[in-house]
Amino acid sequence: LTALSMRLEEIELISTEDEVRAEARTCLEQVERMTNVVTELLDVSKRQTSQTEAIHILEVFNMAREEWEDQFEAAGRPLVFLDEAERPILADAGKLGQVLATLIENSLRYGGGTTRVWAHAGTSKRGVVIEVSDEGEGIDESLAPDIFEKGVSGHGSTGIGLALAHDLAQAMGGRLELKTNKPPVFTVSIAAIPASLDPDRVMPEGPLM
């Protein structure tokens, strides 16, 4: 992966065609994310805790949009992000970003129609749920119960991505589940910051003195 990254960086630097440079930059981002995934695979089983903090979902959504919207546009498919939770969550931004990237990439490769990433309040009001769905054929009924097991895949892939995403969600105190298999709807459940502790509400705007 290091050699591939160096080659992509070289192409991005020496190419005079904007389209080639843009494609090289996109590929480089994918390689960097894959490197992170491999690293997580090596140590996720050793980590029992995660450095979580108060983050805004829109920050994670904006990063995901920047990474994926061009690829969805090239495929002629809409990618929609909607934050109706409108409150900070307690999560690890890097891990949450990788979980969403796995779900979005799978939707792009194997799904169809509009891919929607929707954050909303959980039923308990103490958490936030992020749903990733599309309008494709979905997941075979026989695979659904074991979809997060390593090696389980209905599309000839390694079957590592969803298993890792499941572990990453757990590592930051969240939960990744398959809500429905047809149409495919995955949910990521995360603890929300109570309104009484929300720094945007507790701390007044402007200077303190």
Stretches found by the model and what they are:
Residues 47-51, 88-91:
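Conserved micro-motifs of the catalytic ATP-binding
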Residues 134:
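Acidic ATP/Mg2+-coordinating residue in the GHKL
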Residues 73, 78-88:
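Conserved catalytic submotifs in the C-terminal HATPase_c
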Residues 139-151, 203-204:
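Short conserved segment of the HATPase_c
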Residues 114-126:
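Short beta-strand/loop element within the Bergerat-fold HATPase_c
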Residues 106-108:
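Short helix-loop "hinge" at the ATP-lid/N-box region of the Bergerat-fold HATPase_c
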